[in-house]
Amino acid sequence: MGGISIWQLLIIALIVVLLFGTKKLRSLGGDLGGAVKGFKNAMSSEDEKKAIEDTSAEKTAQTEEKKTESKDKEQA
């Protein structure tokens, strides 16, 4: 009673197609798909950058550890 039925959705879809035309709707869909794809690529590249920064920080910490160990051995 309070919800939208399938027939009402079909009528709304038909009106939208009549107003904008299939070419316009197709181009809008393509633009939306391209935007989603760009967003996903940006998110994955951000994750890769973060992973690279994490590994480089770990390598730096390991190098510093080795330096301090070798200095301690030399002093002993």
From Swiss-Prot:
Region annotated Disordered sits at 43-76
Q: Where in the cell is it found?
A: Cell inner membrane
Q: Which Pfam families match?
A: TatA_B_E (PF02416)
Q: Is Cell membrane set as a keyword in this record?
A: yes
Membrane-spanning ranges: 1-21
Could you provide one GO biological process annotation from this protein's UniProt record? protein transport by the Tat complex
Q: Where are stretches of biased composition, namely Basic and acidic residues?
A: 46-76
- An annotated Gene Ontology molecular function: protein transmembrane transporter activity
- Cell membrane: is it a keyword of this entry? yes
Q: Its GO CC terms?
A: TAT protein transport complex
Q: How does it sit in the membrane?
A: Single-pass membrane protein
**What are the UniProt keywords, alphabetically?**
Cell inner membrane, Cell membrane, Membrane, Protein transport, Translocation, Transmembrane, Transmembrane helix, Transport
Q: Of which family is this protein a member?
A: Belongs to the TatA/E family.
Subunit relationships: The Tat system comprises two distinct complexes: a TatABC complex, containing multiple copies of TatA, TatB and TatC subunits, and a separate TatA complex, containing only TatA subunits. Substrates initially bind to the TatABC complex, which probably triggers association of the separate TatA complex to form the active translocon.
What does this protein do, in the record's words? Part of the twin-arginine translocation (Tat) system that transports large folded proteins containing a characteristic twin-arginine motif in their signal peptide across membranes. TatA could form the protein-conducting channel of the Tat system.
NCBIfam families linked: PRK02958.1, tatAE
Q: Which HAMAP family match?
A: TatA_E
Q: What is this protein called?
A: Sec-independent protein translocase protein TatA
Organism whose genome encodes this protein: Shewanella loihica (strain ATCC BAA-1088 / PV-4)
Classification from the root reads: Bacteria, Pseudomonadati, Pseudomonadota, Gammaproteobacteria, Alteromonadales
Gene name, per UniProt, is: tatA
